[in-house]
UniProtKB/Swiss-Prot annotation:
Name of the featured protein: UvrABC system protein C
Keyword annotations from UniProtKB, A to Z: Cytoplasm, DNA damage, DNA excision, DNA repair, Excision nuclease, SOS response
Binding partners and assembly: Interacts with UvrB in an incision complex.
PROSITE patterns for this protein: GIY_YIG, UVR, UVRC
Cited SUPFAM superfamilies: C-terminal UvrC-binding domain of UvrB (SSF46600), GIY-YIG endonuclease (SSF82771), RuvA domain 2-like (SSF47781)
Domain GIY-YIG intervals: 15-100
């Protein structure tokens, strides 16, 4: 594929809405975008004289992307709204290199009341409940279960879905037994109304619980009083720390973005009855080669939070600033929920103040991350080793084996300021030498870049040889990943450890570095390397134990350790040995040994 092919492809673009995709020489997807007019939009990325090249009017990052592009594909749609939905779906599924992906697939819980029931009660859901008389509260980004427990602790409402006679909750004064008509429906609904008011005003719930705790303590029921005290502490921790009430008892949502030092901060306020009942913030590292696209982020953020399978509580969304596809998003959401949804940018008044507050909190969240010690170290690493990316997302690799037995590899992940153990990976390896083992691990990880986006930095436990190996793999993948390697300093061909700390060398594509053992950058990289080493050793030991157990079974059959090792070397694992053809086993270790294996 060449630029000449690309120029021919540009001539086929229609004057209709749709989605376009850019690909590089290796066929890797670089970018997905949507357009009202595909021909006009896509051609705006290019200049055509004296030959095809990136339009210099675009940002440097966009120009870099276009220089990599050798092929484009497009899909036409009936409308720009359809194109936007398809674009968002492609970004989530395909993880293009130059698109920003907000990695948050969580669905948050709502507390709801079903008024179709004779005696309604509080329940929790993460999806839309298909009933007509439902009152929702939320979403709650943390502590929904704790809030529900606290409500039932103070307000004696029905808790069980079905009950024909007074249950245990009635016996402990936590229910008034409406199932047995021991409370009128009118009185029950009054209590429910008080509970719903307290749910929207946690300070009321806290005061009520404090009164209950005092009564329990006065009655020397200290165990129950302690439980109530713990509930109070939990609810205080859940309270949104932003004290701002809107004069009108309105329901609406607020979104704001902030971007600084390669960090994107998103913030969402949920306002019900004029009060901020929950807030959700998220920090996402943005790689240096990805275009900061405010419009793209607002689209993802709002579409993800207003999906069809969750309750719609607010018809109005306020955003901190204007973005390109705001009106188009209004159209999509209105069609999705079959009612008018407005997305507004308030200019003055209390709505403007709450949007400003959301933006200020988004900025504060970045500042909190920056005050973290490791963030400072990451900035120093970028400057000192001349890295292209700020290393917010780091993958660290190590291998472990014992004389060619139980060969394993390990990858650990450090994201922003903590270990992301959900991304740790283990590898069973075929090869027996360090170089081929590392090549196997890194290649397998690179092949997954389309499913799990690449990090900012790879840290390899090894020297320059393994650094060069990693570089080849990254270049062939087309990803933008910085690489460092860490190895023990060698004296007389032996690893040297000085008193007070390990003497390690850092290898980068710029050269080799010997840092002081007290250098914070070295200590940070050693911390990363040591965690990968710990994880690899632990996996190796567990694998070795399993192999030893299986080996002992063969030894009990009378096979020598030499024969067992010969079988493992040939078949790779015990499962393959047991499944092997009798004839093949006979040729390898003799008829007698083969019979023992197949008979057992």
């Amino acid at each position: 594929m060449t630029k000449e092919n690309l120029e021919n492809e540009l001539k086929t673009l229609p004057n209709s809405a749709g989605v376009y995709q850019y690909f590089n020489q290796e066929g890797k997807l670089l970018y997905v975008g949507k357009a009202k007019n595909l021909k006009n939009r896509v051609k705006s990325y290019f200049a055509f004289t004296p030959n095809l090249h990136a339009n210099p009017r675009n940002s440097l990052r966009i120009q870099k992307m276009i220089e990599e592009t050798v092929h484009l594909e497009f899909i036409t749609t009936n409308s720009e709204a359809d194109a936007l939905i398809l674009e968002n779906s492609f970004i989530k599924q395909l993880h293009p290199k130059y698109n920003i992906l907000l990695r948050d697939d969580k669905t948050y819980p709502y507390i709801y009341v079903n008024f179709e029931e004779e005696f309604p009660r509080f329940e929790i859901t993460r999806k839309l409940v298909k009933k007509s008389k439902i009152k929702y509260f939320g979403p709650f980004f943390k502590g929904a279960r704790e809030l529900l427990d606290a409500l039932y602790l103070y307000y004696p409402l029905k808790q069980k879905a079905s009950c024909k006679s007074p249950c245990i909750f009635y016996q402990i004064s936590r229910c008034l037994a409406p199932c047995d008509k021991r409370i009128s429906k009118e009185k029950y609904l009054e209590i429910l109304d008080e509970a719903m008011h307290a749910l929207l005003n946690p300070s009321i719930l806290i005061k009520n619980l404090e009164k209950q705790m005092l009564v329990l303590a006065q009655n020397e029921n200290y165990e129950e009083a302690a439980k109530v005290r713990d509930q109070i502490v939990t609810i205080k921790d859940l309270e949104v720390k932003v004290e701002m009430d809107v004069a009108k008892l309105e329901d609406f949502e607020v979104f704001a973005l902030a971007f600084e030092d390669s960090m994107l901060s998103t913030l969402r306020f949920v306002v019900q009855n004029g009060k901020i009942i929950s807030a959700n913030s998220k920090i996402t590292p943005i790689k240096n080669d990805i275009q900061w696209d405010q419009n793209e982020i607002y689209k993802q953020l709002i579409l993800e939070n207003f999906s069809m399978d969750i309750p719609l509580l607010a018809n109005v969304i306020y955003v901190y600033e204007e973005f390109e596809d705001r009106v188009l998003l209004e159209e999509i959401l209105s069609q999705r929920f079959d009612k008018k949804i407005s997305i507004k940018i308030p200019k003055i008044g209390e709505k403007r103040r709450i949007c400003d507050l959301a933006f200020q909190n988004a900025l504060l969240n970045i500042e909190k991350e920056q005050k973290n010690h490791d963030f400072t170290i990451q900035k120093e690493l970028k400057f000192y080793f001349e890295l292209e990316n700020l290393p917010n997302d780091i993958e660290i690799f190590d291998n472990s084996h014992l004389q060619g037995v139980a060969n394993v590899g390990a990858m650990v992940t450090y994201r922003i300021n903590s270990w992301d153990k959900s991304k740790y990976r283990k590898f069973h390896l075929k090869h027996k030498n360090d170089y081929d083992q590392m090549r196997e691990v890194l290649t397998r990880r690179a092949l997954d870049f389309d499913k799990i986006p690449p990090p900012d930095l790879w840290l390899i436990d090894g020297g320059k040889v393994l650094l060069d190996l990693a570089k080849k793999i990254i270049v062939s993948s087309g990803a933008n990943v910085d690489i460092l390697a860490i190895s023990k300093e060698k004296i007389d061909a032996k690893a040297h450890r000085a008193k007070g700390g390990a003497k390690d060398k850092i290898h980068s594509l710029k050269g080799e570095f010997s840092l002081s053992i007290n250098d914070k950058k070295l200590q940070f990289l050693q911390k990363l390397r040591d965690e990968a080493h710990r994880f690899a050793i632990s996996f190796h030991q567990n694998t070795k134990k399993k192999q030893d157990l299986k080996s002992s079974k063969l030894a009990n059959l009378g096979l020598s350790s030499g024969v067992i090792q010969k079988l493992l070397a040939y078949y790779g694992n015990f499962e393959s040995i047991y499944k092997a053809d009798f004839k093949d086993l006979t040729m390898l270790v003799g008829r007698k040994a083969a019979q023992k294996i197949k008979e057992n």
